[in-house]
Amino acid sequence: IRIDGVASMLYLDYGKQPGTWTPNMYGGNENLDAIEFLKTMNKYIAKRGDGCFTIAEESSGWFGVTAADNDDPLMFTYKQNNCWTKDFLEFMGTDPLFRKGEYDKLTYGMLYNYGEDFMLSLNHDDFREKAFVDMVSGSDEKAHLSDIKAALGFMYAHPGSKMFAAGQDAGLEKFMSEL
């Protein structure tokens, strides 16, 4: 189960102007009810033991989305690594002649990789306007497919669980709005 927009649930002031939101009972901006709801939901799902797991799409940098090194985590099974996805797709879209100064986009994720249980994903949000095969650089189909093979190899060798959506792993040539 993938939960979108977790950051907007966690903060009372998320996307709001100053003075348009009310602090919690401790004076903070954390949404205590939403935090408790997410913890309870995740504990219940984990307790069922039927193989179901939860993925948080959380972009605010909240520490303790998964059970990693936190006394009071939200208990999601995985946190979707959106920063890795953005950097990865930018790198793959860069012409190979100009990638020399761009390798930090591939390695930066390792600086924070072990702070949470991350899931690397290339999901429907990433392919609304272009198919994966059209996002990689290359002058012809052979170059595109070579880049895709290299990209998949890098992704699968990178630590963390993986998630592909919408047939992009099979070289689907249509983007989401055409399906």
Where are the regions a protein language model picked out?
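Conserved alpha/beta catalytic core and glycan-binding cleft of carbohydrate-active enzymes
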Residues: Q17-S177
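Active-site groove signature of glycoside hydrolases
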Residues: I1-Y14, I55-A56
